Regions:
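Generic anion/oxyanion-binding catalytic loop in active/binding sites
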Residues: 14-15, 70, 81, 122
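Long, hydrophobic N-terminal alpha-helical segment
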Residues: 1-21
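Short hydrophobic/aromatic segments of transmembrane alpha-helices and their interfaces
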Residues: 8, 86, 115-116
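Acidic/histidine-rich alpha-helical segments that form the ligand environment
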Residues: 58-104
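Short, contiguous alpha-helical
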Residues: 15-64, 104-141
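Structural signal for well-ordered, non-membrane alpha-helices
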Residues: 1-5, 33-41, 86-100, 131-134, ...
Length: 141
């Protein structure tokens, strides 16, 4: 959040060349944290968790999913996005603290030949994803 603290309201809502503002990036991260908890940790159907069509989640096509998430969030206020981001992050932390480490190390998908652990998906939708979008936001400074 250090990089976000450097942004005033104008910078928070100014889109980059791809059309996303820092606020849009933060709303996107919140969507994916919620998705990670609902789909990966709670094992609910992805389309229900993400509130998008089942067809969109079937192939995990980010060129379909991410624009839908963007459209849903683009008109939200900066404060609303920041408040939800904070609440969601706190929920992620609480959920991880209450999950036994052994469960995080179990394969997420029974059909995965690589037997990748749940923890890999958690990292991908949290710290790995945060880093990616932090870099995007920093380029806008």
């Amino acid at each position: 959040m250090d990089v976000v603290a450097k942004l005033d309201e104008k910078k928070m809502t100014t889109p980059d060349e791809g059309g996303w503002s820092p606020r849009d990036n933060l709303a996107h991260l919140t969507e994916w944290m919620n998705s990670m908890m609902g789909y990966h940790m709670d094992k609910r159907p992805p389309h229900e968790v993400m509130r998008i069509s089942e067809e969109a989640t079937r192939g995990w096509d980010m060129e379909v999913i991410n624009p839908e998430l963007f459209e849903r969030n683009k008109d939200r206020s900066t404060q609303d996005v920041l408040d939800e981001l904070k609440r969601t992050y706190e929920t992620v932390l609480a959920k991880l603290e209450s999950t036994p480490f052994e469960d995080l190390m179990k394969p997420r998908h029974a059909h995965d030949p690589e037997k990748r652990p749940l923890l890999m998906w958690v990292i991908g939708d949290t710290s790995g994803h945060f880093e990616e979008h932090r870099q995007v936001i920093e380029r806008m400074l």
